[in-house]
Amino acid sequence: MLLFSVLLLLSLVTGTQLGPRTPLPEAGVAILGRARGAHRPQPPHPPSPVSECGDRSIFEGRTRYSRITGGMEAEVGEFPWQVSIQARSEPFCGGSILNKWWILTAAHCLYSEELFPEELSVVLGTNDLTSPSMEIKEVASIILHKDFKRANMDNDIALLLLASPIKLDDLKVPICLPTQPGPATWRECWVAGWGQTNAADKNSVKTDLMKAPMVIMDWEECSKMFPKLTKNMLCAGYKNESYDACKGDSGGPLVCTPEPGEKWYQVGIISWGKSCGEKNTPGIYTSLVNYNLWIEKVTQLEGRPFNAEKRRTSVKQKPMGSPVSGVPEPGSPRSWLLLCPLSHVLFRAILY
């Protein structure tokens, strides 16, 4: 009887270790009438270390797209470079992981003089800003482009140096930098952010990461709509649809890939726009391809050098394909990706 009990116990332990994991429940809190579980589902295994930029090892191969009032909720690991920049624990801008020390964002997010770096934090490694598993990093330095012009938003780029390095894994991945711009390069582009999903309703703020598809426009065509457009800017939208990034998740990345399954590259930083979600009216982004040398110079001067040449990979010119998968068909319910600003916040920053 004792031997049988020992064998039974061993079989139960072995089964627990080697058997399939219990499927995770569906996610979340009720958002606009859709009831979901307390937290977003997490990956069914611990994150594994990664070093490749633009990689989405957890997300690749998954095809589920949750729609929130016609918008789209990002899947776990779909935008592992995305971060939330917060002041006194209040989200106000977005950003992206450049490497373990550096966060890339927009200068206009940090354009003032009185909030010290130690009052800022960066949240990463999660889609849900209420998740207990999110990682929070302190900021050591705020660095703005010295030629940023508030009047026309030229050179709208900034860097945050973290107080301690990020332990990169497949939920915290640096984004790649491109070597060339142009709509002919990119097959699929997205923006993502935390914020409002209805321009008229400031209470429609989300704690879950939302995403919207984008197509990069021809610069000459866009400059006819926006006379103050400079060569340091690019335009992106989704023709005949109301997808847009708007007030608030400024500083977040516009990311593209040349082919499904390949690496992702940050081609733009959410900067400004004429309106939110109007058909055939694009948003304006900082054209990141113009700033590789600036990034290298600044990071070198700050003692945490970033060598873009070692991280960039040339992407092949590809013809534009059909609209990306998971995008609602015309006529289906949808809403804008809207993002909320934080008012009356002042920053102390270094200019380079």
Swiss-Prot record:
Is this entry keyworded Ribosomal protein? no
Cystine bridges: 93-109, 189-256, 222-235, 246-276
**Among the record's GO biological process terms, what is one?**
binding of sperm to zona pellucida
Question: Which UniProt keyword terms apply here?
Answer: Cell membrane, Cytoplasm, Disulfide bond, Glycoprotein, GPI-anchor, Hydrolase, Lipoprotein, Membrane, Protease, Serine protease, Signal
Q: Which residues form the active site?
A: 108, 156, 250
Q: Which superkingdom?
A: Eukaryota
Q: Name one GO cellular component term.
A: cytosol
Lipidated positions (GPI-anchor amidated serine) are: 325
Query: Which stretches of sequence are listed as region Disordered?
Result: 308-330
Matching InterPro entries = Peptidase_S1_PA, Peptidase_S1_PA_chymotrypsin, Peptidase_S1A, Trypsin_dom, TRYPSIN_HIS, TRYPSIN_SER
Catalytic class of the enzyme: hydrolase
Any matching Pfam family: Trypsin
Tissues where this protein is expressed: Only detected in testis. Expressed in spermatogonia, spermatocytes, spermatids, Leydig and Sertoli cells. Expressed in prostate cancer and ovarian cancer (at protein level).
EC?
3.4.21.-
The biased composition feature labelled Low complexity covers: 319-330
Signal peptide (from-to):
1-18
- In the record, what terms sit under GO molecular function? serine-type endopeptidase activity
Peptidase S1 domain location, by residue?
A: 68-300
Glycosylated residues, chain numbering? 240
From the UniProt record, list the residues forming the propeptide. 326-352
Q: Which family does it belong to?
A: Belongs to the peptidase S1 family.
What does this chain do? Probable serine protease, which plays a crucial role in the fertility of male mice including sperm migration and sperm-egg interaction.
Protein name, entry field:
Serine protease 55
What species is this protein from? Homo sapiens (Human)
